[in-house]
Amino acid sequence: MPADVRPMLDRMVHGTVQAVSALATDVPERRRLDGRTVLRWFGLLCLMGAAFFGGYVAWLLWGTGLQTQRAQDALRPAIEGQIADPRPPSEGPKPGSQVVPGSAYAVIEIPRIGLDMVVVQGTDYTSLKAGPGHYVDTADPWDGTGRVGIAGHRTTYLHPFFNLDQVLPGDTIELLTGFGAYTYTVTKNFVLPEVTAGVVLRQTSQPTLVLTTCNPRYASSQRLIVEADLTQPTA
């Protein structure tokens, strides 16, 4: 073999060995890099998911409240004008009369929990965004008989009934309407499964008030119920 060829062959062999060696060691390294990349992306996705979920919860708890507050501000002047100059209860809408969902119905005041909000007509999804809602198939306070039903959100849309569990027997609830003011005294505070809670809205001859909301907080498997008897109607 010519002398000048051997060094060239040696260099070729040495280079090939180095290349094979580098390839052999590079595969696990690439796998390690790929594994770390997957973990980084997974961590990033988890952070993004947590941020999205946190933002959604914040919107439910506080963002929806802004929407309800705007509705309350728009509704209050009209109903307060009616309250300031009430008409006789006999002139109030009769059972079965047409109502406008989402329209101002009354102002509810519960001193125990510091509640003072406009009640709207209706308990559909849209109406309850504006505030507590009157079950339109139940009685009106000015009827002088029957059960008045009002529902309210527990944790969203300004959460009017967030602390309804703290309303106890003996506490008072005031309904201020364009046909007089009505004071109710609480007699019961209890919980029922959601599927059976409708029984509390059955009509009676006794003039009563029933408040309903979801229970426990942040869930809806049950209904928290407050019942109260009419103790002081004021025309």
Question: Which residues fall in each region the model found?
Answer:
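Terminal targeting segments of Actinobacterial cell-envelope proteins
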Residues: 1-39
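Solvent-exposed, non-transmembrane regions of membrane-associated and secreted proteins
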Residues: 34-235
